[in-house]
């Protein structure tokens, strides 16, 4: 039997790379890797965005104030608690650069980019593994035991990719209290929250004002079916930390059309 040769690491939605490596025509691939809403972009966006093509002849507002205010209205928080980025991936990277975690605990199986970005700043990632026998539901008592003082960052995807398991807000409070006691920062990725039957019951955004060890990430790639626009945002009540992250960020990482797409008033 021939030994299987390992393939290079690449994102599962990179159909051109799959075609190149495996020889499968990209037209014959049905991709389940990116979890983008199959209904596609909204009718309003399809109709309105072409009207704003001239916007690419101008630099966008460096502070993205109108966009942040619109997002703030959408998620019911002060726009000063919001930082926008070039997709949630840029924000994951920025959080890692600022926090410089040495020992991160990631609830998995989950998105591989968390571990990748943590490794780039010299940190190590350990996994708290959800069990298929428990339908991938979080065992809060077991997680609490794993949150020891040598852990400095906890990463949660809620709802989780790929298991779809959810953590309700009351459970999240228990986790955050435990982490605060041990000096652990918590990054919650809510990229898939709009797919949940009741997003308002699981989002951690209402907790941002009460926990300075919490940051929540979201974006428009999945539910709003616009990964090519690259628009993500972070919500954090710790404004000192948010300003630190912003200071590390390059200017104008959100292009003009993405900013318009995210701003319902445009």
What are these regions (language model features)?
Residues 97-156:
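PLP-dependent aminotransferase-like
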Residues 1-58:
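N-terminal "arm"/small-domain region of PLP-dependent enzymes with the aminotransferase-like
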Residues 64-103:
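Phosphate-binding glycine-rich loop
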Residues 41-42, 63, 213-265:
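PLP-dependent aminotransferase class I/II
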Residues 71, 118, 179:
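Short hydrophobic alpha-helical segments of the AMP-binding
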Residues 27-28, 78-82, 103, 190, ...:
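Short acidic capping loops at alpha-helix termini that bridge into adjacent secondary structure
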Residues 137-150, 162-186, 190-223:
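Active-site pre-lysine segment of PLP-dependent enzymes
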């Amino acid at each position: 039997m021939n030994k299987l040769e390992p393939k290079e690491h690449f994102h599962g939605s990179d159909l051109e790379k799959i075609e190149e490596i495996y020889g499968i025509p990209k037209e014959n691939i049905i991709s389940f890797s990116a979890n983008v809403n199959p209904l596609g972009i909204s009718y309003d966006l399809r109709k309105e965005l072409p009207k704003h093509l001239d916007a690419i002849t101008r630099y966008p507002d460096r502070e993205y104030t109108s966009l942040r205010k619109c997002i703030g209205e959408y998620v019911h928080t002060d726009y000063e608690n919001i930082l926008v980025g070039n997709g949630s991936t840029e924000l994951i990277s920025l959080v890692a650069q600022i926090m410089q975690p040495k020992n991160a605990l990631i609830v998995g199986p989950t998105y591989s980019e968390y571990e990748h970005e943590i490794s780039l700043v010299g940190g190590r990632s350990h996994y708290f593994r959800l069990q298929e026998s428990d339908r991938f539901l979080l065992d809060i008592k077991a997680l609490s035991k794993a949150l020891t003082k040598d852990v400095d960052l906890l990463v949660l995807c809620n709802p989780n990719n790929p298991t779809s398991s959810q953590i309700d807000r009351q459970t999240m409070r228990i986790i955050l209290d435990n982490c605060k006691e041990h000096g652990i920062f918590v990054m919650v990725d809510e990229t898939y929250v709009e797919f949940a039957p009741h997003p308002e019951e699981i989002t951690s955004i209402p907790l941002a004002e009460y926990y300075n060890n919490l940051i929540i990430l979201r974006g428009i790639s999945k539910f709003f079916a616009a990964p090519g626009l690259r628009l993500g945002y972070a919500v954090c009540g710790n404004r000192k930390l948010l300003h630190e992250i912003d200071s590390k960020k390059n200017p104008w990482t959100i292009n003009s059309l993405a900013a318009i797409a995210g701003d319902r008033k445009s």
